[in-house]
């Protein structure tokens, strides 16, 4: 193990003032929401304004802060410069389908769209991304930094790869539009559609591609974007973290922080056999994590607490452990 380890805190994120997008992700149930809320609270202490977005369909932000959030940014109680919003992909899909039904006089297109929309693999991530796109220009100008509380690993990876996939797809569509546009327009007018609607559609696609290209560039810029991996000290979680790190590297998305949550630190005088057995197991996987990541990662160790971290006060208290290493009680 290297002697000059990187500091075991997330202070490096607070110090990097150029960061615009911060993602927190990992396996389900490892404390992603608590970590993202706590990080957002710490950022609010040193940045002008912070927006916390949940892209997890389970939406735990409302539970964590004990306050109802919606798809519109809402100020978090007890803070002047911290805002939160929860993106719901399912309702966004439903909205899109309803718009199609309104535009379609005989209703056939709408019902077909409904069947299609909910059957497409990855549609949740696509709609989450589309919802963020709606806010991206306005919000990124309004807020100095945006923190994402993401869905469990698989969803997150598809979500982060979506800009690249979409950029390529829209590029192909645009080239098809220039080749087949007149024919599509003719067919559309024969079927009762407006002749100009195809040109409008391709113009919209082209402008959307511009926005997506910009976001894609920002996501791949380590000065603008970073990903905080959250895990617990168990085999499956560590395995998933390694997979996440590999995938993020393949997508060229920066990651250099790992939060290891729910660690047991039993007192020496404790005679709890279960605690000591679990602690030995945790220490084994923690040693593996250090072996894998010490050279390039800040590894933050957080304890398993006796009570839930809920409400602004408890989250604020917990957030201090992200910037000051946890000291085990004697």
Curated annotation (Swiss-Prot):
Subcellular location: Cytoplasm; Endoplasmic reticulum
GO CC list: GET complex
Binding-site residues for Zn(2+), renumbered to this chain: 272, 275
Sorted UniProt keywords: ATP-binding, Cytoplasm, Endoplasmic reticulum, Hydrolase, Metal-binding, Nucleotide-binding, Transport, Zinc
Active site: 56
Pfam families associated with the record: ArsA_ATPase (PF02374)
Keyword field contains Cytoplasm: yes
InterPro entries named among the record's database cross-references: Anion-transp_ATPase-like_dom, ATPase_ArsA/GET3, ATPase_ArsA/GET3_euk, P-loop_NTPase
GO terms assigned for molecular function: ATP binding; ATP hydrolysis activity; metal ion binding
Binding locations of ATP: 27-34, 234, 261
SUBUNIT field: Homodimer.
Function noted in UniProt: ATPase required for the post-translational delivery of tail-anchored (TA) proteins to the endoplasmic reticulum. Recognizes and selectively binds the transmembrane domain of TA proteins in the cytosol. This complex then targets to the endoplasmic reticulum by membrane-bound receptors, where the tail-anchored protein is released for insertion. This process is regulated by ATP binding and hydrolysis. ATP binding drives the homodimer towards the closed dimer state, facilitating recognition of newly synthesized TA membrane proteins. ATP hydrolysis is required for insertion.
NCBIfam families listed in its UniProt record: GET3_arsA_TRC40 (TIGR00345)
Entry's family note: Belongs to the arsA ATPase family.
Protein name: ATPase GET3
